[in-house]
Amino acid sequence: MNIIKKLSLLSLIASMLFLVSCDDDSSDPATSGTLNISINLTNPDSWPAEGTVFCSLDKTWPPSGAPYKSVVLQSAQVSNGTISLVFEDLDFDTYALLSVSWLDPNNPNPACNQAVWGTHSGSIQAFYADAVPFTFSAENSELSLVVGAVANTVTPDCPPTG
């Protein structure tokens, strides 16, 4: 009888150790960033019938190529004047600009075929070079930004061709 008690006690202790060792540790450090985005659209009824609207994230500004991350927005996503998005799995890095823009389908010139609807900060007068950069890191892995946007189809003048 003594052996049965010892084996039962040993089995119970082994089971408890197994259960404790399988506990999920939710304090694992983050390995990528998450950006929660709210786009407040002043005039959602002015959504263009043609062209493409983008929400884009750039690491550098002015951009020197394609955005780091970009999604196409649809007018059906607007709810009470707001579009909510989440960009996940972002590199731990510094980002220069979060923007919303409309691409003119009739203008193939990338230097002047987009109308900026809004950015997370910065001004059109400085062509958004004064936007405040933001950084993702293990200590700062989730951010929320708000973009105030005005739907428009006014693109900048194209530079003269030589």
Locations of the language-model features?
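Sec-dependent bacterial lipoprotein signal peptides
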Residues: 1-22
